[in-house]
Curated annotation (Swiss-Prot):
Protein role: Partially responsible for acquired pathogen resistance.
Domain spans labelled SCP: 34-149
Disulphide-bridged cysteine pairs: C70-C138, C113-C117, C133-C147
Similarity comment: family membership: Belongs to the CRISP family.
InterPro entries per the UniProt record, alphabetical: Allrgn_V5/Tpx1_CS (IPR018244), CAP_dom (IPR014044), CAP_sf (IPR035940), CRISP-related (IPR001283)
Designated name of the protein: Pathogenesis-related protein 1
Alphabetical keyword list: Apoplast, Disulfide bond, Pathogenesis-related protein, Plant defense, Secreted, Signal
Coiled coil regions, renumbered to chain: none
Organism: Arabidopsis thaliana
Pfam family name, one: CAP
N-terminal signal peptide: 1-26
Lineage of origin: Eukaryota, Viridiplantae, Streptophyta, Embryophyta, Tracheophyta
Amino acid sequence: MNFTGYSRFLIVFVALVGALVLPSKAQDSPQDYLRVHNQARGAVGVGPMQWDERVAAYARSYAEQLRGNCRLIHSGGPYGENLAWGSGDLSGVSAVNMWVSEKANYNYAANTCNGVCGHYTQVVWRKSVRLGCAKVRCNNGGTIISCNYDPRGNYVNEKPY
């Protein structure tokens, strides 16, 4: 195949645009959210979650309400909820990994946190079996990730698993 200068430029341009655009989308699919949640759950012997479009629709609707100010304010809705914020393009996988990193603060034997661990305990909450997540780019360029859990978890004095 013989490429002209313009053809070579076009091929390189398309490849670069694809390399810049695809990674941000590649870690925001329902399968991506489920994979990282279920890895964390499996590590402590908790069964997998299933994607639930009804729960995801709730997450999308609420995340859209946060687009204007990008503040991490919980919805107070019917589901368990984890929120994450990034100043740029935060992926869903990165958000879930931040929540899972709180495992280091959780003492299962005492069922206590040494620091923040409530996001982690919601991720691994045994009775939460349906998941829905959403990502919204805020007006200020930041990103909000919202994951909702059905049924909700994090009940006082109850271990997650």
